[in-house]
From Swiss-Prot:
Disulfide bonds: none annotated. Gene3D superfamilies: PurM-like C-terminal domain, PurM-like, N-terminal domain. It comes from Synechococcus sp. (strain WH7803). This is Phosphoribosylformylglycinamidine synthase subunit PurL. It comes from the Bacteria. The gene is purL. Mg(2+) 1 binds at E85, N541.
Length: 765
């Protein structure tokens, strides 16, 4: 029995509770059902109490947490569905298929709501890129994402990629998707109508993906390579047909409820639909389209074969609906019915193979109780004692240009063109700002069907994914709050008003005091950031146990990584901007926190890229997040875009102000003549310190009078404004500290280092 419980990821206490709920011992199929549905991946048994603290209400929220995806009202008939999810463990053992099926799964969450997918983003984390093992993972994951997205015909428009030893052996692959509603009514997943048929559509069921949900809820080890059968195999061309057939079916009015079959397959779909509708579902496995012979009830119920959906259909309309799917070359079969008794009853070969109360699987699931320590762990407190004065002193003739080049060569900061050039960013012809051109992607709001498709298509949605994982490692609360702030800042830099959030909480085990403290503090910071910035959480994903067991038995946890996916509204696509300088003579201005004060705790080198790349350190307490100033700085930038005063906007984040300015020059090929304030402040702080509420803008030379008038507005009086210099056409990147020149590099030199960092390491330069 002990080995059977381990196989299902259950404890002895879980087994006793299962016996109590059933009033008997479970059979193998039932034990498997409980194993996947009581896993962290499906029921959030460690994180659910923390998630309840997230703000989830707002004037634009149509659907919040609990459905396949969140939905927000963007006005003028535009309703946007969006969601982020992880496929971390599968991608670690089978990078191509793990990443590809992660894309397929998040797309199904979107179109299951009745929305047509319009864009994809991803947030990726890997170990050091100089290591061959990491290079193989990167190549496989990027190829998998590219393959599925390109084939299914949905553009991948943005994302982020970071490299750190903490992710060695346990990469993070988070996929986000956006979709525009095409149905009048949002499709929900709660079953209703006793006697209504349950219809299976899509691909056939095989043995691939067996136990994927339980696999995703355990740490990785050297033996995990043997778990390749737990990784699903995707077919993007079949999914393309499934998208079209589902959207047609939803328009017909014949579908009562819909649920995609992702983690835990048929078990999850049946139990969630039944529990949400307070009804039951009877499932006959003999009717399920199978691709393999002799499959047991256990295998049918736990298979995670891809591109499958489960519908509850209006009685009498099932044949017409199935004909619709068959025209698209898809399987379709009536496999059960809605019951009044609130159970999931599974039949096979004329007998009951399993019968479990639906709520026991999908609603009334266990919660693991953890005690939150009252003080930060001792190692964190030790980190917080670090001071910038502990850094090695530098000589007066120190080569700051070499430091800047080293930062631009860091794979986390460097150009990700090697990644996004493999993605089709322009399919559907709605991508306005693609990856690499700005701090957020922008996609035109142009539905293919419905009244909204007939209106002018001059509105857009902006999207971004962000997480400063080095900050979160040192202070989870500040780091998670900074993730929300940076996401909103990135949207504001393209002129978008932040609307709502979907989150992906990637963490190590919560079963240690430090692990649970990290998770709890990050949730607190994320919640506060969303509350103050007015961006409610519409749903997301929790991925725990992201850690690798070494050969000596020790566990190597990842950095806690709460990825924030945020969407924003662009009212006028003619006022969207990027990060590149536009013309010589434009003023270069820093809005927000400057680096010219030693004691300002809103900016610093703790946890910075400079600290890591130049000194090999990760220590200190990250800067305090000033959410009030964030709001003010972002509002000023958005209004300046609206008035047509700006030529560019770019947030200062990884690498600090010097790197932000360099990225603007690299993107444009134009030079800059700039001077940073702060006499008496260490040069490294002025050049490379990081902090929130900092945006570099270039103001059109012909708009300086209007810019001055805007700054005089009382609403913007509290925003610090620092004139740094001007855009130049001499092709040099020149910065001085006061009157002392410290950087004078050819923009071409910066560009070559920035562009070649990934290709050189991957052998494709």
């Amino acid at each position: 029995m002990a080995s059977a419980l381990r196989q299902e990821g259950l404890t002895q206490e879980d087994y006793i509770e299962i016996q109590r709920r059933l009033g008997r011992d479970p059979n193998r199929a039932e034990l498997g059902m409980f194993g996947v549905m009581w896993s962290e991946h499906c029921c959030y048994r460690n994180s659910r109490p923390l998630l309840r603290g997230f703000p989830t209400d707002g004037p634009r929220i149509l659907v919040g947490p609990g459905e396949n995806a969140g939905v927000v009202d963007l006005g003028e008939g535009h309703r946007l569905a969006f969601k982020i999810e992880s496929h971390n463990h599968p991608s670690a053992v089978e990078p191509f298929q793990g990443a590809a099926t992660g894309v397929g799964g998040i797309l199904r969450d979107i179109f299951t709501m009745g929305a047509r997918p319009i864009a994809l983003l991803n947030a990726l984390r890997f170990g050091p890129l100089d290591e061959p093992a990491t290079q193989g993972l990167v190549e496989g994951v990027v190829a998998g994402i590219s393959h599925y997205g390109n084939c299914v015909g949905v553009p991948t428009v943005g994302g982020e990629v970071a490299f750190d030893p903490a992710y060695r052996g346990n990469p993070l692959v988070n996929a986000m998707a956006l979709g525009l509603m095409e149905t009048d009514d949002i499709v929900k997943s709660g079953a209703s109508g006793v006697g209504n048929p349950v219809v299976y559509v899509g691909s056939t069921t095989g043995r691939d993906g067996m136990g994927g949900a339980s696999f995703a809820s355990a740490e990785l080890s050297a033996d995990s390579l043997d778990d390749r059968p737990a990784v699903q195999v995707g077919d993007p061309f079949l999914e393309k047909g499934l998208i079209e057939a589902c959207l047609e079916a939803f328009q017909s009015g014949d579908v009562v409820a819909a649920q995609d079959m992702g983690a835990a397959g048929l078990t999850c779909s049946c139990s969630e639909m039944a529990a949400k509708g307070n009804v039951g579902v009877e499932l006959d496995l003999d009717r399920v389209p199978a691709r393999e012979q002799g499959m047991t009830a256990y295998e049918f119920l736990l298979s995670e074969s891809q591109e499958r959906m489960l519908f509850v259909v209006q009685a009498g309309r099932e044949e017409a609906l199935m004909q619709r799917f068959r025209r698209w070359g898809l399987q379709a079969a009536v496999v059960g019915q809605v019951l009044e008794e609130p159970v999931v009853r599974v039949l096979q070969h004329g007998s009951v193979a399993a019968e479990v109360p639906a709520r026991a699987l999908a609603e009334d699931t266990p919660i693991n109780q953890h005690t939150l320590i009252s003080e930060p762990p001792e190692d964190i407190q030790e980190h917080w004692r670090w001071s910038e004065t502990d850094l090695p002193s530098v000589s007066r003739d120190h080569d700051w240009g070499a430091d800047l080049l080293a930062l631009l060569d860091d794979p986390t900061i460097a150009s990700k063109r090697w990644v996004y050039r493999q993605y089709d960013q322009q399919v559907l012809a709605n991508t306005v700002v693609p990856a690499g051109g700005a701090d957020a992607a922008v996609v035109r709001l142009r539905p293919q069907q419905g009244d909204a498709s007939l209106r002018g298509a001059n509105r857009g949605v902006a999207a971004t994914v962000d997480c400063p994982n080095r900050w979160v490692a040192l202070d989870p609360e500040r780091g998670a709050m900074a993730a929300v702030a940076e996401a909103a800042r990135n949207l504001s830099c393209v002129g978008a008003v932040p609307v709502a959030v979907t989150d992906n909480l990637n963490f190590p085990s919560p079963e240690t005091p430090k692990g649970y403290w990290q998770l709890a503090m990050a949730c607190r910071g994320l919640s506060e950031g969303c509350r103050v910035l007015g961006t409610p959480v519409t749903g997301g994903n929790v991925s725990l146990y992201n850690e690798t067991r070494a050969d000596d038995g020790s566990l190597q946890p990842i950095h806690p990584t709460p990825v924030v996916g945020m969407v924003g509204l662009v009212e006028d696509l003619g006022r969207v901007g990027g990060l590149a300088w536009r013309q010589a003579g434009d003023a270069v201005v820093l809005l927000g926190v400057s680096s010219d004060e030693r004691q300002d705790d809103r900016v610093g080198l703790a946890g910075s890229s400079y600290q890591g790349v130049i000194h090999g350190l990760l220590t200190g307490r990250p800067p305090r997040v000033d959410l009030d100033l964030e709001q003010r700085v972002q509002a000023l930038v958005r209004q300046a875009w609206e008035q047509g005063l700006l030529a560019s906007a770019h947030d200062s984040s990884d690498g600090g102000l010097a790197v932000a300015l360099a990225e603007c020059s690299i993107a444009s090929g134009l030079g800059v003549d700039g001077a940073l304030p702060g006499d008496g402040v260490a040069p490294e702080r002025r050049l490379f310190a990081e902090g929130g509420a900092r945006i570099v803008v270039s103001v059109r030379a012909e708009c300086m009078d209007a810019w001055t008038s805007l700054l005089a507005d009382e609403a913007h009086a509290a925003v610090p404004v620092t004139i740094l210099g001007a855009v130049a056409d001499h092709g040099r990147f020149r910065l001085s500290l006061g009157s002392q020149p410290v950087l004078d590099q050819a923009v071409q030199t910066l560009t070559e280092r920035f562009d070649q960092a990934l290709p050189r390491r991957l052998g494709t330069a």
